């Protein structure tokens, strides 16, 4: 007798052992068991102005640049995550502001071109369930010394990124940048992604290809602390031999012109949603 799939529960491969536990489903199939997650986060970011024509080459169908071509590179270090039973992991992302126009939906926000993570579990759930463009790399904890913060990323011994933050100064809570107001004209707002899943056996064809949205929160949690200052980013150009499956990603960022840096930040916060409100943009 074969096993049935319960349409009320979430499954991922391998399905043979029952519903998969993860960020949006706890043990026993309990949905949204961790939506009040109180993880502790440290987020480091550096932004720079680049060449708009170079960013346009990275845009999927329906996407256009919005405003200045400012790229933000960020690393976030997370601990005490509920759905991992108190464990943590780190992420590295690259985004820039876009507008997406579908047949029905219009959305604005940062386009998350890629998100590296140093743990398999969030990579699989994020790619399959949410449509994030997630891949793996090593993301060690930042090194803080002599007034500087250094962050790196590597893959099997090849270091492909260096981030340096300097002259960081504490920002008083009354001076925190205001949260972006949500559009009132029906335009959606949040982080925008492009989900693509290839079709098995029909190489070059897709099982899924569409834009998805992580909706912006109406009441985002303010950070516990914020520092602002200066920063630099350097992606180290790679050969195929260095990064056989990622060299083209690294080199695309390495080739971006840096016209000027637009500041850096270090932010500490507590909490994080389970992204159960993730939706397809149609």
Regions found by a protein language model. Name each.
Residues 66-99:
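Short, structured protein-protein interaction patches enriched in aromatics and acidic/basic residues
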Residues 38-40, 86-90, 145:
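Solvent-exposed loop and beta-edge segments used for protein-protein assembly and interaction
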Residues 95-133:
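Hydrophobic alpha-helical segments and helix pairs
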């Amino acid at each position: 007798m074969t096993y049935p799939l319960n349409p009320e529960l979430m499954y991922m491969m391998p399905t043979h052992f029952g519903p998969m536990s993860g960020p949006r489903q706890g043990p026993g199939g309990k949905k949204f068991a961790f939506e009040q997650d109180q993880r502790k986060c440290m987020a480091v970011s550096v932004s720079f102005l680049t060449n708009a024509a170079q960013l346009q080459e990275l845009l999927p169908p329906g996407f256009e640049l919005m405003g200045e071509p400012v790229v933000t590179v960020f690393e976030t270090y997370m601990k005490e995550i509920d759905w991992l039973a108190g464990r943590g992991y780190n992420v590295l992302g690259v985004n820039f502001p876009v507008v997406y126009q579908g047949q029905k939906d219009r959305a604005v926000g940062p386009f998350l071109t890629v998100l590296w993570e140093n743990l398999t579990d969030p990579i699989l759930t994020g790619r399959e369930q949410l449509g994030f463009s997630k891949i793996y790399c090593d993301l060690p904890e930042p090194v803080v010394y002599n007034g500087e913060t250094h962050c790196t990323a590597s893959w099997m011994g090849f270091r492909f990124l260096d981030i340096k933050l300097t002259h960081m100064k504490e920002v008083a809570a009354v001076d925190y940048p205001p949260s972006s107001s949500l559009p009132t004209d029906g335009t959606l707002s949040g982080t925008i992604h492009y989900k693509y899943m290839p079709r098995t056996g029909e190489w070059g064809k897709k099982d899924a290809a569409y834009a998805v949205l992580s909706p912006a929160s109406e009441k985002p949690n303010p950070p516990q602390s914020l520092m602002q200052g200066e920063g630099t980013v350097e992606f180290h150009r790679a050969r195929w031999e260095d990064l056989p499956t990622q060299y083209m990603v690294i080199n695309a960022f390495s080739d971006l012109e840096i016209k000027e840096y637009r500041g850096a930040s270090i932010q500490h916060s507590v909490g994080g949603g389970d992204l159960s409100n993730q939706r397809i943009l149609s």
